[in-house]
Amino acid sequence: MSSLTAPITLLSAVTATGASKAVQADAGQPAFLQVSGITSATVALQGSLDGTTYATICTALTADGIVTIANAPKYLRANCTVYVSGTITAKILY
């Protein structure tokens, strides 16, 4: 996979818990997740080596912001793990 020059949307105006579809990143390269629209919710960046078993790989966001990882695993996804209110969008660049 080659690095993206523009972010792609993983979560688009979601109003419930749930994970996005995974993207295949450049393993070992940096990745950036930007989340907006959080009023009362938690969004985690999750990674996987096999595309099946996912784990949260950095601090989950409870307010709008950006998380950065220096060495991405092969697969990445955004997961809204707690939802109370907000209209959440998550975009990734890797």
Q: Where do the language-model regions lie?
A:
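Edge beta-strands of jelly-roll/beta-sandwich modules across compartments, strongly enriched
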Residues: S2, Y83-Y94
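Tryptophan-centered short beta-strand motifs
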Residues: P7, D50-A60
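Aromatic, loop-rich ligand-recognition surfaces of beta-strand-rich domains
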Residues: A19-V35, L93
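Exposed aromatic-hydrophobic patches
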Residues: K21-Q24, D64-A70
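Noncatalytic modules at the cell exterior or secretory-pathway interfaces
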Residues: Q29-L33, A70-T87
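Acidic glycine-/aspartate-rich tracts in secreted/extracellular proteins
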Residues: I38-A41, D50-T52, V82-S85
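Conserved Ser/Thr-centered positions that define the repeating blades of beta-propeller domains
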Residues: Q46-S48
